[in-house]
């Protein structure tokens, strides 16, 4: 699948860079802690002309780092893919994603762990799907964004 291919390539990149990487299943460990938790998804829509990349952290942000993580990763993905920004279509479910919603769900990241849900593009759009057939494109962009973020907050 698209998501798994990107996640595996991303984990490989980050491991090569010396990071400790946890590839998690849909069930997040209770109060999971990390420098960042990135949940990778692909979207679809009956309107096959809808396309673009979007991402979201909880709103309001659970911590001051989430907006910085979003900006760093978004910047790199947009540079790498030249996709349109689809943030206007961020859903309420994305904003209250269970893996980041420690108040409602036991199996969620700790509040201090910055989280970001990324929607790589639309499986229902040919242009986005063409890009998503190259998992390395997204893995490299997300890895670079994560490095930028960690440098910005002084963790690298």
What function would you assign to each model-found segment?
Residues 2-156:
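Active-site-proximal helix/loop segments of hydrolytic enzymes
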